[in-house]
Amino acid sequence: MTVAAASTEVDSGTPGAGPLSGSVALVTGASRGIGAAIAAELAAQGALVVGTATSQEGAERIGAALPGASTGAVLDVVDAAACEALVDRIVEQHGRLDVLVNNAGITRDNLAMRMKDSAWQEVIDTNLTAVFRLSRLVLRPMMKQRHGRIVNITSVVGSSGNAGQVNYAAAKAGVAGMTRALAREVGSRGITVNCVAPGFIDTDMTRALSAEQVASLTQQIPLGRLGQAEDVAAAVAFLAAKGGAYITGITLPVNGGMHMA
């Protein structure tokens, strides 16, 4: 495991002023899209952020985009030893870990009849098992602090379903169930556990769609537009800061009204 910054260590330093001043946050999958927006928003609100990417180039991009001592780290969330090493390093260098945002995820889409076992397992390993593993790893420092915020990024697909994504839908629904159970376990220790469930967000994936496809999507959305990554980031920051202190075990939809529970 390497960390992209001036050295191969997680940088130390003092977070800036803001609602999250003095806190340390770990954001997985932070090199682009929703993850990059979340990392930027938490840093803007004063947190020292460690954002992860699967490549050195991605980690360096995170470090260059974030202010102050916030930095990027190379991490494969499926690698249990690497996850443990990174969490240990953050706590060792900064003395605490306040916020975990489980954002990293993959898709391996196909119709169920054509889906290979490997495509199912890769998505479950990355989008569900890794979320559990990282959440478990941060519980010890959070319990010691008697304070912590875990925010899991799920998807509207976890509740509405989507053809060609049985693996992705199962993983995201699983994260929502895990979130509720974990929230009941750790609430007495001052730790909240919540989900943010984006709908269709303007990212690299949706930008590859045709104008006709985008028009078809927006017709399903009462607010009449695709969401922005910053919309999701604002929801995460709310749950991570003081405003979300009495909220736990919920899934906050950020979908423009396309799916209403």
Regions found by a protein language model. Give the residues of each.
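Conserved glycine-rich cofactor-binding loop
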Residues: V24, S31-R32
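Conserved glycine-rich Rossmann-like NAD(P)H-binding loop of the short-chain dehydrogenase/reductase
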Residues: Q45-R61
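Substrate-binding pocket helix/loop in short-chain dehydrogenase/reductase
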Residues: L111-A112, K116-I124, I150, L217
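Active-site helix of classical SDR
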Residues: S135, A171, T179
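Alpha-helical segment proximal to the catalytic Tyr-Lys
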Residues: R140, R184-S188, A245
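Residue(s) in the substrate-gating loop at a strand-loop-helix junction
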Residues: S155
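Short, small/polar-rich loop/turn modules that mediate ligand/substrate recognition or access, typified
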Residues: G187, T192, I247-G249, N255
